Amino acid sequence: MFGGPPECPERPDCLPGLRRTYGLRFRAFAALDAGGPLTRQALEAGDIGAALLFTTDPAIRAGHLVELTDNRDLQPAENVIPVLRRATATRYGAGLFAALDAVSARLSTAALTALNAQVQMNGRDPHAVAGSWLRDQGLGRGTS
């Protein structure tokens, strides 16, 4: 059984794409969430056998899930990018852009996975994790 977001049976990069690109067919589909906690829990419990997760999900690195290689580029790259309201950009201007650029330059997939693990697997407060990371990177006061 494959688990994924409710729109997966119609999305070209989900079930139809897996069938067309890799010849994969699943007996059933479970509508869950978009690679979030419901999907992860269903995989870990054995309720589903396959799903799409984000590469920054720490459960993949925990050793009990197998990450498959998408050597035919079915899945698009989904990079983390800052998005601002125009009013926010106008209010804070170049200083905010410079700060966001500095964070983006240091926030690799490996770093984001490690940060996610601290929150999702170790139960740490997201603000504290982000603040520590910012301080460790020499970026400002480390407050979030």
Predicted regions and their residues:
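Ligand-binding clefts/hinges and TM-proximal coupling segments of bilobed small-molecule sensing domains
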Residues: 10-13, 94-141
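A bilobed periplasmic-binding-protein/Venus flytrap-type ligand-binding module shared by bacterial periplasmic
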Residues: 78-93
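Short coil/turn segments
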Residues: 4-11, 86-89, 105
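Short secondary-structure boundary segments
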Residues: 54-56, 86
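Ligand-binding "clamshell"
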Residues: 45-50, 59-73
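Bilobed "Venus flytrap"/periplasmic-binding protein-like clamshell domains
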Residues: 1-36, 40, 124-128
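A post-motif C-terminal structural segment
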Residues: 54, 74-80
